[in-house]
UniProtKB/Swiss-Prot annotation:
Coiled coil ranges: none
Protein name as it appears in the record: tRNA 5-methylaminomethyl-2-thiouridine biosynthesis bifunctional protein MnmC
Chain segments carrying region FAD-dependent cmnm(5)s(2)U34 oxidoreductase: 270-689
Organism for this UniProt entry: Yersinia pestis
Main location: cytoplasm
Length: 689
């Protein structure tokens, strides 16, 4: 997925006050009554809002070509909110709205357009508050306490559609086929679009569109839709509506299949860190019943227990799956954390910005690669030594890259607050329950703890145990590494208190936390070491790294680590720096089933390729891990991905990036190339239980 910035919409306003696209030379909505046009063409054209009452599932999925001003979305949201108010016991509880937009509007232009509809003001304000930056790809926005999921895919719809994951196949209940008129936007209205619509639509799903153009009608019919001409809006004589009578076969990549959970009414989460808490909340938003087991006496005793952690994206300038994931993860994390703060969830934090310094030739080369992309300045910007120093409050000694939306937060505070929120929502917590064994018995998982604790049974289990993930029989083949890290807590001084931003070099230094008048500086990186004792050598090394990277200035001498205040945690790391999230793969079954995968794909006939079975996994066993040093950035999105997968929902990343997060990816990559798969060496793993 191309994460490069995209062009925003250029607008003019006609005499009626209607926005006009300069790119397409067409109006965004009717000069007569845009709101009524939306009701007639898109809602009524698909049978809504009347269809809400008879919808048989908890979630209804809409897809749209051309988000524009968001009028269709806002109108649907308002009607759904009214429906939920009038029918609180109805089966339908959530909307999922997927929209593709090539030229997203600036938020100021959105506000001007929304001013025409005061009846939508409360909904429009919430949308604008979370309006994403113009970065290509999917922006997942959660609204109405999770009752509304908005996936905004920025980019050309014809470029995006081939990249979509299998999770969107046969999912859409209703299409709003919008976009500008075919005569104004001929590139969009084509066979590829119509076929993709059919592939993504569930049997019985519908569409509506303002146009009645013959080639559109024929294209939709050829794709598999039954198409009908009906009365158009206002002076327009006709428009098209239709239904997909039967499921359309969609090609898949079965080796990266992401199965849903069979049962979400009895889920056990094993783990007590930030990703465990976020996963619990993401599941609860969908109605899941969650029980959590933590080995410690309270949450955040592992890698999530630090006082301050930096929040900023991981870029590499390669426009690959890693950069795509962390760009999406960072922007999603900021939206999630801001929403929590608005809800009154308190945790120490400062969105003060993060500056990454080019302190030597190697780091300078990396930053130059990152800046090959002309990022929006609100996301990342090249800055000189003078500019960075002015923002930081201290001489940074180097130029570098600045992330204005970054900052720091207290992982321990946040994890405790999230756990409390999940408990308020109904989650049961069992602390001091250290999982000893995991065994599948009949249709449940048996969880065995200490000798004095009774075994527990659950239908579905999620492993989120950090560096301990490889300890279980089902997961010990996964290529995960334990990495010790010691963070030093240093008292502030009049000079250090001037630091206004997080500085990243061959380490990091945070601004002072007003709550305790200390900074955090770190962190050591000891691969394969799971000890958490204090080490004087690592304490001193944390200081020395800062001095080595900024020898031109004197203020780093103010850093005093002599009181030996520190905290040590153990990260769970992966060599490709991407998390693992999804169903736990069955190692032995994967190797047996896919031993000739490369041959079948390269030399087998179409029928043989189509007969390839989905990747073997342990039933009803899921995992999230490998967040490494970037858990604050990645945890919200991986939690959302896992919950969406378990509920069988569309996922908020493209297929290539999701494949790069799949727990079986290292094995599958080798099998696809016909190479042998090597398991973890016994020397690199703890005892498997």
């Amino acid at each position: 997925m191309n994460q490069r910035p995209i062009q925003t919409a250029t607008l003019s306003w006609n005499e009626q006050g209607t926005p006009v696209s300069e790119q397409f030379g067409d109006i965004y909505f009717s000069n007569e009554d845009g709101l009524e046009e939306t009701h007639h063409v898109f809602l009524k054209g698909n049978g809504f809002p009347a269809r809400f009452a008879s919808h048989p599932q908890q979630s209804c999925i809409f897809a749209e070509t051309g988000f524009g001003t968001g009028l269709n979305f806002l109108t649907l949201w308002r009607d759904f909110a009214l429906f939920r108010q009038q029918s609180p016991n109805a089966t339908l509880r959530r909307l999922h709205y997927i929209s593709f937009e090539k030229y997203p509007l600036h938020v100021a232009d959105l506000a001007s357009a929304h001013a025409r509809w005061p009846e939508l003001a409360s909904f429009a304000e919430q949308l604008r508050a979370q309006w994403p930056l113009p970065l290509a790809g999917c922006h997942r926005i959660l609204l109405a306490d999770g009752a509304i999921t908005l996936d905004l895919w920025f980019g050309d719809v014809n470029t995006l559609l081939p990249t979509l994951d299998d999770s969107l196949n046969n999912q859409v209940d209703a299409w709003f086929l919008d976009g500008f008129a075919p005569a104004k936007n001929p590139d969009m209205w084509n066979e590829q679009l119509f076929n993709a619509m059919a592939r993504m639509t569930r049997p019985g799903g519908t569409f509506s569109t303002f146009t009645a153009a013959g080639f559109v009608r024929r294209g939709l019919q050829q794709a598999g839709f039954n198409v009908t001409k009906v009365k158009g809006f206002g002076q327009k004589r006709e428009m098209l509506t239709g239904t997909l009578p039967q499921q359309i076969h969609a090609p898949t990549a079965p080796w990266y299949h992401r199965p849903a959970a069979t049962r979400c009414d009895d889920i056990a989460i094993i783990g007590g860190g930030i990703v465990s808490a976020l996963t619990a909340l993401a599941l609860q938003r969908r109605g899941a019943v969650v029980t959590l087991y933590c080995a410690d006496a309270q949450p955040a005793q592992g890698a999530s227990g630090n006082r301050q952690g930096a929040l900023y994206p991981l870029l590499n300038g390669k426009n690959d799956a890693l950069e795509t994931f962390f760009t999406s993860a960072f922007t999603f994390a900021r939206r999630q954390y801001d929403q929590l703060l608005e809800q009154g969830i308190a945790f120490d934090h400062q969105w003060c910005g993060v500056s990454q310094l080019a302190f030597d030739d190697k780091s300078r080369g990396k930053i130059e690669k990152m800046l090959h992309t002309q990022w929006p300045v609100e996301f990342a910007e090249a800055m000189s030594r003078e500019q960075l120093s002015e923002l930081a409050g201290l001489d940074c000694a180097h130029d570098g890259i600045h992330y204005p939306a970054g900052g720091w937060l207290c992982p321990s505070d946040l994890t405790h607050a999230l756990m409390m929120l999940a408990q308020q929502n109904g989650m049961t917590c069992h602390y001091q329950h250290e999982l000893q064994r995991l065994k599948r018995i009949d249709s449940q998982w048996q969880l065995t703890f200490g000798q004095s604790q009774a075994a527990k049974h659950h239908a579905t289990v999620i492993l989120a145990t950090g560096h301990r993930l490889p300890e279980w029989e089902q997961t010990h083949h996964l290529p995960l590494s334990a990495v010790r890290g010691q963070v030093s807590h240093i008292p502030t001084t009049p000079v250090l208190s001037q630091l206004q931003q997080v500085l990243c070099y061959d380490g990091y230094l945070t601004p002072v936390n007003p709550a305790n008048q200390h900074h955090c500086i770190g962190a050591s990186y000891q691969r394969g070491d799971i000890a958490t004792d204090f080490r004087l050598t690592e304490q001193q090394e944390n200081r020395e790294r800062l001095l080595r990277c900024l020898p031109q200035v004197s203020w780093p001498q103010q850093v005093d680590v002599s009181d030996n205040q520190a905290r040590c945690g153990v990260r769970c790391a992966i060599r490709d720096h991407l998390p693992m999230v999804g169903a736990v793969p069955d190692y032995a079954a994967t190797l047996a089933q896919y031993q000739d995968l490369s041959r079948r794909i390269q030399h087998g006939g179409e029928s043989e390729v189509n007969d390839i079975a989905v990747a073997p996994v342990w039933p009803e066993l899921f995992m999230v891990g490998g967040l490494g040093s970037r858990g604050l950035c990645s945890a919200p999105l991986v939690a959302e991905i896992l919950a969406a997968q378990m509920f069988g929902e569309p996922l908020p990343l493209d297929a290539k990036t999701l494949a790069a997060l799949n727990p079986n990816r290292f094995w599958i990559r080798k099998l696809l190339k016909g190479r042998p798969v090597q398991t973890r060496s016994p020397a690199t793993q703890e005892s498997s239980r």
